[in-house]
Amino acid sequence: MAVKIRLTRMGSKKKPFYRINVADSRSPRDGRFIETVGTYNPLVAENQVTLKEDRVLAWLANGAQPSDTVRNILSKEGVLKKSTILNSQNKFKVG
């Protein structure tokens, strides 16, 4: 099962609001999901983003692939940098 971190559209017509969800890549955009890890509001001047960083890092460590838009959001929030640091630390452990 390929797992993706992607946006699910909420809100009303012409006023989008997105949830950042972890879902199976084969499920529809607004369909079944595994876990909600954040929200994204593009209508606010500063593009309001809330994230559960620990859960996002856990899913990335388990192999979840972010969509292009979510990858951009995570990099702006600094989560991807933490993920790469954690991955590089795990590679050097001997055990």
Swiss-Prot record:
A Pfam family reported for this protein in Swiss-Prot or TrEMBL: Ribosomal_S16
UniProt GO MF annotations: structural constituent of ribosome
Keywords of the record: Ribonucleoprotein, Ribosomal protein
Ranges in a coiled coil: none
Top-level division of the source organism's lineage: Bacteria
GO cellular component: cytoplasm; small ribosomal subunit
GO biological process: translation
InterPro entries: Ribosomal_bS16, Ribosomal_bS16_dom_sf
Entry annotated with the keyword Ribonucleoprotein: yes
Membership in a protein family: Belongs to the bacterial ribosomal protein bS16 family.
NCBIfam families cross-referenced by the UniProt entry: S16 (TIGR00002)
HAMAP family hit by this protein: Ribosomal_bS16
PANTHER family: 30S RIBOSOMAL PROTEIN S16, SMALL RIBOSOMAL SUBUNIT PROTEIN BS16M
Name of the protein this chain belongs to: Small ribosomal subunit protein bS16
Classification of source organism: Bacteria, Bacillati, Bacillota, Bacilli, Lactobacillales
Gene symbol of the encoding locus: rpsP
